[in-house]
């Protein structure tokens, strides 16, 4: 696939950002199929996890508001980023090696690694990681986490809008992906922040 093909319909052409598709080697036990081509009967022997993929044109971005502040995470704060991510999930975990690897990619942007804090207490409430592909002009939200005890206060929207505002003028558009059936409803958060689209990709793993 050429870059020009991808840019005509980013979320409909690939399930991941363009730069990743150029470097990631798909394991043989995994298949990725767009919903338009998906036939449940044909994949009956595979476990299916659907993922939405949405896009933001970065033209109209709400200000980052709420009882929070954010700061750029320093290299020395990678253990804190790891803790915030892992405490936000019950079904996955990231390692220091993974986080360090993210910071060596061609899309790495140091100022898009944010830690969100309660404005009064200074306590970390979550974090956000995004990147920008300078070739495709694509910004991508990679990790958006809010600790369980701080949810339902607007921290997720604060983090997303903080990242989008930092991308404006540097990327032509932004994308994000997440589990369709996640009980925390990440899709709802992203749509409230201005993301649009209807693309769904099925991540299929051989049983």
Report residues per predicted region.
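Conserved active-site tyrosine of GNAT-family acetyltransferases
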Residues: 41-43, 186, 190-191, 195
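Conserved acetyl-CoA-binding loop-helix of GNAT-fold acetyltransferases
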Residues: 143-148, 152-168, 187-192
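A conserved beta-strand-loop-helix scaffold within acyl/acetyltransferase catalytic domains
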Residues: 91-146
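A short, internal acetyl-CoA/4′-phosphopantetheine-binding micro-motif in the GNAT/acyltransferase core
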Residues: 9-10, 14-19, 144-152, 180
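Conserved hydrophobic beta-strand within the GNAT/NAT acetyltransferase core sheet
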Residues: 141, 174-178
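A short beta-loop-alpha structural element at the N-terminal edge
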Residues: 69-81
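Conserved acyl-CoA
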Residues: 9-28, 158-174, 196
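Acyl-donor-binding surface of acyltransferase catalytic domains
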Residues: 1-66, 202-206
């Amino acid at each position: 696939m050429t870059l020009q093909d991808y840019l005509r319909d980013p979320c409909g052409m690939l399930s991941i950002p363009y730069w990743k598709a150029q470097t990631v080697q798909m394991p043989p036990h995994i298949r990725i199929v767009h919903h338009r081509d998906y036939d449940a009967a044909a994949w009956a022997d595979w476990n299916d996890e659907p993922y939405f993929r949405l896009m933001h044109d970065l033209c109209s971005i709400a200000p980052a508001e709420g009882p929070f502040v954010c700061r750029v995470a320093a290299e020395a704060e990678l253990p804190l980023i790891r803790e915030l991510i892992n405490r936000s999930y019950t079904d996955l975990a990231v390692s220091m090696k993974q986080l360090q690897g993210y910071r060596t990619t061609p899309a790495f942007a140091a100022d898009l690694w944010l830690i969100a804090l309660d404005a009064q207490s200074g306590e970390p409430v979550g974090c956000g990681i995004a990147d920008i592909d300078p070739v495709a002009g694509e910004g991508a939200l990679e990790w958006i986490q809010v600790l369980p005890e701080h949810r339902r206060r607007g921290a997720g929207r604060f983090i997303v809008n903080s990242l989008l505002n930092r991308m404006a003028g540097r990327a032509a558009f932004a994308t994000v992906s997440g589990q369709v059936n996640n009980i925390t409803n990440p899709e709802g958060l992203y749509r409230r922040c201005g993301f649009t689209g209807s693309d769904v990709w099925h991540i299929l793993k051989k049983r």
